[in-house]
């Protein structure tokens, strides 16, 4: 049974293009399924976060990360009496707008797009689900419910200041109330992202040799976890020791979020999702002590992993790929695939063309971007 402050499927604000109700699935289940079956979601399999795709098969991709985020979101939302289908839907959609080569690719594309309104992966996710997916006979995009669109747009909180063009375009059509906080389900999806990447970046960094278990014995959160495992399982083989310690870190993060949320919900006693939106602060968050400890972990990961010499070397290589491909397609848009030509021919100015090229480049997988760069740029 859903809590009164959860998003109730029967009270959805609906879709831009009206559709008949499904016999077997709720509106949010249909949204989730449409995301899973989208081309953009499938492409996440070959988009990486930190490590370049061809570096190894073990490391997380955007797809595996999104699945992990969805799992965490379902767990937390279920305990809190929230709509698990909506939380899962937003979690699965949150990375759809990412470029090839992780944040490195986004930084390069954003710089190239500065004269044309900029580029932001969160806004690009909105552009994908409202415009770029073209599989349905009656509409462009996925025709998601208002609640799913709100969650994608605002899962990190109210959106203030100048809007990225993709988000401004969507908001003009749907009025996503960007000045308010999002539903609790969207807030859960956001913090599930924090939990998942903090956990798996520790895993991947250890696996890659960028740091060791001894390094983690010096840090908050991880040090107590390793100490507990060593006390319970003396002499445990290294891989099992690592896994047991990091699953405790993972568990502590999830349990902390649930405990804090339960306390805040009990204190506020919200009677509807609208009261959640108007609370003036997030209801789903880490406790202050754990948040401070996780800041230490993130600082460690930033210096030892995200800015490691081997990673920085790859950053330079893949930045060059984006920096070469974007201006090439701007000069010669006829190089774009046939299905993109209609949009190119309809482009009325350079800004519109740049946004089409950015859509195409952002949609590339790591592997395809490297292949196209080798083919077109030698």
Swiss-Prot record:
Keywords: Hydrolase. GO terms for molecular function: dGTPase activity. SUPFAM superfamilies: HD-domain/PDEase-like (SSF109604). Transmembrane segments: none annotated. Residues 15-26 have a biased composition (Polar residues). InterPro entries: dGTPase, dGTPase-like, dNTPase_2, HD/PDEase_dom, HD_domain, PHydrolase_assoc_dom. It comes from the Bacteria. Residues 62-198 form the HD domain. Belongs to the dGTPase family. Type 2 subfamily. NCBIfam families: dGTP_triPase, PRK01286.1-1, PRK01286.1-3. This is Deoxyguanosinetriphosphate triphosphohydrolase-like protein. It comes from Cereibacter sphaeroides (strain ATCC 17025 / ATH 2.4.3). The lineage of its organism: Bacteria, Pseudomonadati, Pseudomonadota, Alphaproteobacteria, Rhodobacterales.
